[in-house]
């Protein structure tokens, strides 16, 4: 891990108020990380819909911490200690975190009247959002 390059990347993303979007993952999550240059919001979407009737998550995690590593110790056990250290260093910077095993799709929208951005996350092929996150609020520095 190159700390100087990592800091430079964090600065670029935060100073531009860019949102990091990721898809085709196995979990839906939203994380907001504070940096000296402002917050960074990352949205991960579980776009692999194996069960079109799964409209409620089996598991919801709201605490960012070492349980990400310890929950699956069999995955790359040789890197477990390093991953624990990375999570430990990152945890104090996390202001908001939500993760769930819910496949679906997300829609980012901006309200024309108040210029507020929000994410609506729909379970499977649902017609009503299961989760709504105020992205504008997360992008406001604390």
Features from the language model and the residues they span:
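Active-site His/acidic residue clusters
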Residues: 1-4
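Metal-dependent phosphoesterase/phosphodiesterase active-site architecture
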Residues: 7, 11-19, 26-142
């Amino acid at each position: 891990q190159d700390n100087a390059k990592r800091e430079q990347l964090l600065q670029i993303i935060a100073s531009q108020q860019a949102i990091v979007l990721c898809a085709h993952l196995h979990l839906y999550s939203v994380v907001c990380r504070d940096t000296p240059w402002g917050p960074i919001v990352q949205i991960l979407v579980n776009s692999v819909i194996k069960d079109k009737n799964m409209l409620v998550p089996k598991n919801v995690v709201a605490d960012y911490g070492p349980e990400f590593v310890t929950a699956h110790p069999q995955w790359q056990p040789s890197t477990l200690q390093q991953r624990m250290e990375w999570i430990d260093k990152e945890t104090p910077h996390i202001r908001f975190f939500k993760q769930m095993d819910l496949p679906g799709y997300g829609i980012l929208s901006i309200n024309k009247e108040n210029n507020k951005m929000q994410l609506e996350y729909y379970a499977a092929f649902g017609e009503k959002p299961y989760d709504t996150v105020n992205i504008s609020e997360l992008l406001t520095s604390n």
